[in-house]
Amino acid sequence: MQSNELKSLLETAFPGAKVHVASPDDVHFQAQIVTEAFVGKPTLARHRMVYAVLGERMGGEVHALSLRTLTPQEAEAN
């Protein structure tokens, strides 16, 4: 899977989100997702939301994924 494909999946799953995806090899990915959908949710719940989108791709097309999941307010503060 290429970075732009992963980005598109995440943008579809989280409408209005700001998504940045990087990968040195199209197997190991780093993603930052900023969305209102994360408001009021702890980090673990946010990550589960992302993994639910990826489903069976995790461990296959996506071997490793480093996540940074933020609300818009958290992103502004950083």
Question: Where in this protein do the model-derived segments appear?
Answer:
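C-terminal structural segments of small proteins and small subunits
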Residues: 44-78
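A short interface-forming secondary-structure element
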Residues: 32-45
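Solvent-exposed beta-strand sheet faces enriched in polar/charged residues
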Residues: 22, 34, 68-70
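Short, solvent-exposed polar/charged micro-motifs at secondary-structure junctions
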Residues: 29-33, 75-78
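Short active-site-proximal "capping" loops at secondary-structure junctions
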Residues: 26-28, 38, 72
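Short edge beta-strands and adjacent turn/loop segments
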Residues: 14-30
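N-proximal, solvent-exposed amphipathic alpha-helical segments enriched in charged/polar residues
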Residues: 1-17
